[in-house]
A protein has these predicted regions:
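Gly/Ser/Thr-rich phosphate-binding loop
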Residues: 5-22, 30-90, 102-104, 109-112
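Active-site phosphate/pyrophosphate- and oxyanion-stabilizing loops and adjacent acidic/basic residues
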Residues: 27, 53, 57, 92, ...
């Protein structure tokens, strides 16, 4: 069980060289008092998703290893990663399409959007079989499988932006987008503002 106060001691004791993180972990560790163990570890890098852009470089500079932002789903059978320097640490970037994976960003009518616009991330394998390497389907739910694969692309449910250089930038889960006065507001953006306040220990 994760404990911010014991975490570095556990990392040092196990001689871990790679760690996995969720977005809630970096602020919890940064809020801990400086301890000698946090610089006695052998960690080469961390991989995960959801580190707040304002904390990304701060974490790396304090603890001495990079946090590699990745994206993946059980259904896709592969990941994307922002693992090539210079990494885009202040943007929620998680990499460019690679490894035979094609990606595009669409609106609610599945129309492809221009670069830089927020929309749902769709992915598929580049080749005669777009489902190659993906899951075979949702258990006993062929309707949900067909809906996810409509138009020959897998609908991830993630809202992203694809930049002119092909970099994909995470915004939020589609179900977490708040509609207000005609605007799409990512819940993660509001949570980031709250998390930055010194009186807030954790945001859920």
């Amino acid at each position: 069980r994760f404990s911010p106060s014991r975490w570095w001691a556990d990392v040092v004791a196990t001689r871990a060289t790679v760690i996995h993180y969720l977005g809630v972990v970096p602020p919890l560790l940064l809020n801990q008092p400086v301890a000698p163990e946090e610089r006695q570890h052998k960690v080469k890098f961390g991989m995960g998703a959801g580190v707040e852009p304002d904390l990304h470089a701060v974490f790396e500079e304090r603890f001495g290893f990079p946090l590699i932002e990745v994206w993946g789903m059980t259904e896709t059978g592969r990941i994307l990663a922002d693992n090539k320097e210079p990494r885009q640490r202040h943007t929620r970037a998680f990499g460019r399409p690679a490894g035979g994976l094609e990606a595009k960003v669409v609106d609610d009518q599945d129309r492809e959007l221009p670069r830089g616009n927020e929309g749902e991330l769709l992915v598929r394998f580049a080749g005669p079989d777009p489902r190659r390497g993906f899951f075979s389907g949702y258990l006993k739910n062929p309707e949900a499988t067909a809906e996810a694969w409509r138009g020959g692309w897998f609908h991830t449910g993630d809202v992203v932006r694809q930049m002119p250089d092909d970099m994909l930038v995470f915004v939020d889960r589609k179900k977490n987008i708040i509609r207000r006065s005609g605007e799409n507001i990512a819940a993660a953006e509001g949570e980031a503002v709250l998390q930055a306040h010194e009186a807030v220990a954790q945001v859920a």
